[in-house]
Amino acid sequence: MFCVQCEQTIRTPAGNGCSYSQGMCGKTAETSDLQDLLIAALQGLSAWAAKAREYGIVDHYVDNFAPRAFFSTLTNVNFDSPRIVGYAREAIALREALKAQSLNADANAAVDNPMADLQLVSDDLGDLQRQAAEFTPNKDKAAIGENILGLRLLCLYGLKGAAAYMEHAHVLGQYDNDIYAQYHKIMAWLGTWPSDMNALLECSMEIGQMNFKVMSILDAGETDTYGHPTPTQVNVKATAGKCILISGHDLKDLYNLLQQTEGTGVNVYTHGEMLPAHGYPELRKFKHLVGNYGSGWQNQQVEFARFPGPIVMTSNCIIDPTVGSYDDRIWTRSIVGWPGVSHLEGDDFAPVITQAQQMAGFPFSEIEHMITVGFGRETLLGAADSLIDLVSREKLRHIFLVGGCDGARGERNYFTDFATSVPQDCLILTLACGKYRFNKLDFGDIEGLPRLIDAGQCNDAYSAIILAVTLAEKLGCGVNDLPLSLVLSWFEQKAIVILLTLLSLGVTNIVTGPTAPGFLTPDLLAVLNEKFGLRSVTTVEEDMQQLLSA
């Protein structure tokens, strides 16, 4: 086992990465190794998908399957070894079909890729785990060095984050042939074990640029389907009655669940990154979407254990449900998996609803505590002139984007302390689950404009980017000249690709934490600092002073 993709990875003087019987996320060595095997199979599939496009052969099922299966290897998504192997088998079958079609078009069709002819050696998981050793990402570290390995992983993990957003967009009916062609090209190239530093750096920026397009179509899918989010108050306390909790990012799953629970007497609560759903008109119209439950994903083993109803996981992040003994009432959807828990293959939530009706639910309603969400792209752009007016009248000094992933590390209290230390004449724009560090606090307002503005899920960084570009255009300056600072927390691969997106757009002087990615060497961090001004957090006082004086 070797996995270094998330922020909680093991760090030792000898090197970084989880490499024992189990990773810090709870992933077993078996599952981790089989995920390496799956990635190799997907690289071979992409090699032939890219080749087939040269003959005008475009298989939309392959285009959907490839990033979706890749998404299953993202942190805290799928821990179920047989399902991982199932994805690998399907990838190989799809590859062979594309290969046959390509050979029909050109008898000399061929691809130069070591993954293009991969076959699984056995049906036995142990045999497959041993085969996977051939594809562990650090297998040639001694030959290429830590810097090249780090850049490969930066590209691989960044592309994995983009694949997750591609899947979210596809669920909402969004398809862009150019994006999929670019995805297959990059995925196939990474399967050749590239070792040119400049080419890898260029690839990382290409992934960032591609992801900006992915976020654009995801934004279109969400807003075209459910309307543009508008500021909405959400209760974060319990309401009496039967209940279901839904977590993850998939708004379509939430919509289907709301439709199927309407009139049943079962209330629905959002959790984690599903919180921004309350801002969408077509979702909040359901009166039994009663509120948001819990805090950051890392607290789920305590909070889910206390929730008196079933829980549906639509995407990341799931962690071991046996710890809180709620494994008999947690349900996984789509690419999510945990051994032994119930998995919903389709869009029918009837078994979940039946279980909710059989459980006690909340016995009484707690005193309401409202927070505000729903500052989507249209709302943010509508406030642009007001922001400029406040700046011109010296009522607004600075905007801090404080957001990103949450996690268990104690150093993440930095982000709470930073948010509460922001001066009263400054605004906080936030997004993603990192907001749970401070989103239940009262930050007041500046002339009626809330000082804490929740822009949505991690992918809604797109809205923040569009706002920044709009403000810069109106003020006749560059984005980096705005009174705007980005203080980002990271945990997994979606955060990595958001960072690559920002860097590829030329955004500089971003501050990240709580730690640097374990796969980035000091040399690589120095390159990113020199080229983009990217740096790690220090202390709240030092960072605040530096950002306000920049």
Swiss-Prot record:
Secretion signal span: none
GO cellular component labels: cytoplasm
Coiled-coil region(s): none
Its EC number(s): 1.7.99.1
Gene3D superfamilies the UniProt entry points to: 1.20.1270.20, 3.40.50.2030
Cofactor details (free text): Binds 1 [2Fe-2S] cluster.
A Gene Ontology BP annotation from the UniProt entry: response to hydrogen peroxide
Amino-acid positions noted as binding hybrid [4Fe-2O-2S] cluster in the UniProt annotation, renumbered to this chain: 249, 273, 317, 405, 433, 458, 492, 494
SUPFAM superfamilies reported for this sequence: Prismane protein-like
Enzyme class, broadest EC rank: oxidoreductase
Binding of [2Fe-2S] cluster, residues: 3, 6, 18, 25
Annotated keywords: 2Fe-2S, Cytoplasm, Iron, Iron-sulfur, Metal-binding, Oxidoreductase
Family according to the record: Belongs to the HCP family.
Its job: Catalyzes the reduction of hydroxylamine to form NH(3) and H(2)O.
Protein name: Hydroxylamine reductase
Gene: hcp
